Regions:
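Positively charged n-region of N-terminal signal peptides that target proteins for export
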Residues: 1-4
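Bacterial N-terminal signal peptides
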Residues: 6-20
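Structural detector for internal amphipathic alpha-helices that build alpha-solenoid repeat scaffolds
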Residues: 25-36, 54-66, 73-77, 85-97
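Mid-to-C-terminal functional-domain signal that highlights helix-capping/loop sites
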Residues: 27-28, 75-77, 96-464
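Stable alpha-helical elements in mature extracytoplasmic
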Residues: 41, 55, 70, 83, ...
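Alpha-solenoid helical repeat architecture
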Residues: 45-51, 78-81, 109
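Second-shell loop/turn segments in exported
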Residues: 47-49, 58-61, 213, 288-289
Length: 464
């Protein structure tokens, strides 16, 4: 935890650094000289950040006088300046609550979607973002970033501590045959992908630093979008109907409710990593939802033995990182705490950073706690009206799901059986007697808070 706290402290300091980039206008606003235009209200907020003690106090008073529409502005000011006493007092006046820091203020804001930001909010926030990285503007052109054009609340978009592509994607990275991957330990976890017989392994110790690969596997263009904060690596098909070329994704540097916002390089639309849908930009009204493909987290040893012809990601990524086992995000993964604020709706049965395996297919969604597989490796269940069987190993965070066609499966002496007949477990399907096959069902691992935050209202939770 001490290293996590140190990291968070450094992050807060880095967030506060752009304060020096806010140049104040010559005009000093007060009750005797109040702001009148949207642009002047932006300058009032700047005055509240960089003015003298009296000027800052006067600025907050002017913002508070405008009413609750200024709550998002004060929350942003708290983010930029740290726990500024005048801003905190202003928030208490408007909310009636003591919001001790930016995290608490963001949770309040998330819980109150009825609060519409003042028209000056956009200008202040873009000024803040561009002081960090001018390239951030490519995601928020005026014609696509108004409130009615976005699928998420602009006031809830938070800077994640890096610039555009500060977490670099791996695009068609160098691969090795399994026999040459001497850097890997048997117990290293990998994302295992197999499409049309083309098996690949992507170690989490590397992917944690990059959070995205764009590849063609088995002739299918795909991207693995890995949100380390959510514990979720989701494999998406990237060829979208109506587009000539597959989409290529990168990391924007932004978060929404502790989930990464990725972007496509063709249109600079922002996408929700968890849902595979555009939330801002030219593609937002195109009705696009990326198709999810199966992916399994498992140990390198288990993947290699099941897929001896597999290729695996090389350490030669073109980037310098510490790719050692268990290095990346070590403190965060070990902590029960979230790094960025978001409301956790329900922890009555499962804690926020407990792992679940989730499926959203067949017109329904359902999640299974990973710890459910401690009792039984095989779970016969259903998603919506479709029967499924899940095969799991909580020690390696591994779950694979398949349709079961009304059959009931069990594990006997390490062999999958139904009605006394053996079935082989492959990456594509279960294979049984008389060449019968049962298709693999796409799903993925995630922290509970992320699954519940994005799908909890419409999703069922296994309680067996």
């Amino acid at each position: 935890m001490p290293r996590l706290i140190a990291f968070l402290t450094a992050l807060v300091l880095s967030i506060a650094t752009p304060l020096t980039a806010f140049a104040q206008q010559n005009t000093i606003f007060s009750s005797e000289n109040p702001p009148e235009t949207t642009e002047e209200f932006v300058e009032v907020a700047v005055q509240g950040l960089v003015g003298t003690t009296t000027e800052r106090r006067n600025a907050v008073d002017l913002l508070v006088a405008e009413g609750k529409s200024m709550i998002p502005t004060l929350v942003l000011m708290l983010n930029i300046s740290g726990n500024h006493v005048n801003v905190a007092k202003g928030l208490k006046q408007l909310t009636g609550e003591t919001l001790k820091d930016w995290r608490a203020a963001m949770l309040y804001q998330e819980a109150h979607p009825e609060i519409i930001p003042h028209p000056s909010y956009r200008g202040l926030k873009l000024r803040y973002f561009t002081s960090i990285d001018p390239r951030f503007m490519q995601f928020f052109p005026p014609q696509y970033s108004s409130r009615d054009k976005m699928k998420i609340r602009f006031e809830e978009i938070a800077w994640g501590g890096v610039r555009v592509d500060g977490i670099p994607s791996l695009d068609n990275p160098k691969l090795l045959p399994a026999a040459k991957a001497e850097y890997l330990r048997d117990d290293d976890l990998v994302f295992g992908v197999s499409i049309n017989g083309d098996a690949r392994a992507y170690p989490l110790r590397i992917m944690g630093w990059h959070e995205m690969f764009n590849e063609v596997i088995g002739g299918v263009p795909v991207a693995l979008a890995y949100c380390t904060l959510c514990g979720s690596g989701i494999l998406f098909e990237t060829q979208v109907e109506g587009r000539d070329e597959p989409l290529v994704f990168g990391s924007s540097g932004f978060l929404y409710r502790s989930n990464k916002l990725m972007f496509d390089r063709a249109t600079n639309s922002l996408w929700n990593q968890f849902t595979g849908e555009p939330v801002s930009g030219p593609l937002v009204d195109e009705g696009i939802k990326l198709k999810i493909r199966p992916v399994a987290i498992t140990s390198w040893k288990a993947w290699r033995e099941a897929n001896p012809e597999t290729q695996v990601l090389s350490l030669e990524t073109g980037h310098y990182r510490d790719y050692g086992s268990g290095v990346v995000y070590r403190e965060y993964f070990a902590s029960p705490d979230l790094m960025f604020p978001t409301i956790v709706r329900d922890e009555s049965r499962i804690k926020r950073k407990d792992y679940v395996f989730g499926i959203r297919e067949f017109g329904a969604a359902k999640a299974w706690p990973l710890k459910a597989f401690e009792k039984e490796r095989i779970i016969n269940d259903r998603v919506g009206q479709t029967d499924v069987v899940l095969i799991g190993d909580p020690l390696t965070r591994t779950v694979r799901a398949y349709e079961r066609g009304g059959r009931t499966f069990s594990m006997e002496k390490g062999v999958l059986v139904s009605d006394g007949k053996r079935w082989a477990v492959t990456e594509d399907a279960l294979k049984g007697p008389k060449n019968k096959t049962l298709a693999r069902v796409p799903g993925h691992i995630a922290y509970w808070f992320a699954w519940d935050g994005y799908l909890g209202v419409e999703s069922a939770l296994y309680d067996g």
